[in-house]
């Protein structure tokens, strides 16, 4: 019979720490949130604006595409512009096909980037593969940059896959095609890391990833990879999709892996809707880490889902307003109110669970449900503090939340202590 302890998060897998532009990935450091731009990197204004938005939203590393000379030439200018804005965000260069040439031809780009991403599936083909891989590794060594060896099943090393499929056939097909593909992904990452180390790249300058688009495949591949390597691991479900589907698929797969102690940095690869906000993927990554109890980024707003007792939309509107105010205020609050990330606010819709949930929050309100008296008890630090009445209950509660934050986390409180 399983005990309750069997369902606790497993200890973090031991991994080698990698310094990426001052951000530590692996080695027991908090799981790092990263993202990627979708601008043309050669468009310096657009790329700077998006990197800034992603970083301000909470992305600790930002990856940019470096696919041609114009993009490579823009990288140091992007880095310089960001620094002038006071944004020292590590930039990761995403290279495919000609990364070796771009790094060699643009030394300022090689210097400005905090990390290089190499895809073993398209770094080169046949006789050129190992040579071009080696050239990128040599550039990483020269500029003392870490490398992410990022395998993706959409661009998997076909020579390795064919070799393993043929071996499986010779052995009488003990493995399914899906299992052989998973093994190919893992071997591609491990063999590439082994080659990089043989070329002189230190172990603490290598991060591995092995991305697929199927939830069960991703869980299996990373379980295999984590058992056979102590390299820091970058988690991400590739081509997760749009909207709810992408969020659910990424959260399910990454959540299971992190519960098992696997993963040192994550990216939520959402397909944005036309004109959509690219920072959404950062918010989802932060929410995932926070709801699982691994990190705290922003105060939590607990709110009931509503039912027949809550035909009024007042509690929904108040919960939304509080959540929006908190998120928009966090860039300032992080500096002004240290520790505010731990705050919990409850906005409940009726008497059934409202008072109880509000008592569990730092500050909470139980709004009147259908047929209830037009009064809303407010609980602060587990005790009923007052009852709000009248047409401005929502506005009054917002002022109470602001006052609570100032008193608990402001400089006045720090001085009193």
Swiss-Prot record:
Keyword Iron: yes
Highest taxon above the source species: Bacteria
UniProt: [4Fe-4S] cluster binding residues: 304, 307, 350, 357
Necessary cofactors: [4Fe-4S] cluster
Reaction equation(s) it catalyzes: (2E)-4-hydroxy-3-methylbut-2-enyl diphosphate + oxidized [flavodoxin] + H2O + 2 H(+) = 2-C-methyl-D-erythritol 2,4-cyclic diphosphate + reduced [flavodoxin]
Gene3D superfamilies: Dihydropteroate synthase-like (3.20.20.20), Sulfite Reductase Hemoprotein, domain 1 (3.30.413.10)
Name this polypeptide is given: 4-hydroxy-3-methylbut-2-en-1-yl diphosphate synthase (flavodoxin)
Natural source organism: Sinorhizobium medicae (strain WSM419) (Ensifer medicae)
């Amino acid at each position: 019979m399983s005990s309750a302890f069997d369902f606790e998060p497993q200890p973090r897998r031991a991994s080698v720490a990698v310094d990426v532009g001052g951000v530590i990935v692996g080695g027991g450091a908090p799981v790092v949130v990263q993202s990627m731009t979708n601008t043309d990197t050669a468009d310096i204004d657009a790329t700077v604006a998006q990197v800034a938005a992603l970083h301000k939203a909470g992305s600790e590393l930002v990856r940019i595409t470096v696919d041609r000379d114009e993009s490579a030439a823009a990288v140091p200018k992007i880095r310089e512009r960001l620094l002038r804005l006071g944004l020292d965000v590590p930039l990761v260069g995403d290279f495919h096909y000609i990364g070796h040439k771009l790094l060699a031809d643009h030394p300022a780009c090689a210097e400005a980037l905090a990390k290089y991403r190499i895809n073993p599936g398209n770094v080169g083909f046949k006789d050129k593969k190992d040579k071009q891989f080696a050239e990128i590794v040599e550039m990483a060594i020269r500029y003392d940059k870490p490398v992410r060896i990022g395998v993706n099943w959409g661009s998997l090393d076909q020579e390795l896959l064919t070799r393993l499929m043929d071996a499986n056939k010779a052995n009488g097909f003990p493995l399914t095609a899906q299992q052989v593909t998973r093994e190919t992904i893992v071997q591609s990452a491990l063999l590439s890391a082994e080659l990089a180390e043989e070329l002189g790249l230190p172990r603490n300058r290598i991060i591995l990833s092995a991305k697929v688009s199927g939830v069960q495949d991703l869980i299996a591949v990373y379980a295999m990879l984590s058992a056979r390597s102590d390299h820091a691991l970058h988690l991400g479900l590739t081509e997760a999709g749009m909207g709810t589907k992408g969020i659910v698929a990424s959260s399910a797969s990454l959540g299971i892996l992190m519960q098992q102690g696997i993963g040192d940095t994550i990216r939520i690869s959402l397909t944005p809707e036309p004109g959509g906000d690219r920072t959404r993927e950062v918010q989802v990554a932060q929410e995932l880490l926070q709801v699982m109890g691994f990190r705290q980024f922003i105060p939590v707003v607990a709110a009931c889902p509503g039912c027949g007792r809550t035909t009024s939309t007042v509690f929904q509107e108040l919960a939304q307003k509080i959540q929006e105010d908190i998120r928009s205020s966090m860039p300032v609050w992080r500096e002004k109110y240290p520790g505010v990330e731990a705050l919990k606010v409850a906005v409940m819709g009726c008497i059934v669970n409202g008072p109880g949930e509000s008592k569990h929050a730092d500050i909470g309100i139980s709004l009147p449900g259908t047929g209830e008296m037009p009064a809303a008890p407010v609980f602060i630090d587990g005790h009923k503090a007052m009852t709000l009445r009248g047409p401005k209950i929502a506005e009054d509660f917002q002022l109470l939340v602001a006052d609570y934050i100032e008193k608990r986390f402001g400089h006045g409180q720090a001085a009193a202590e």
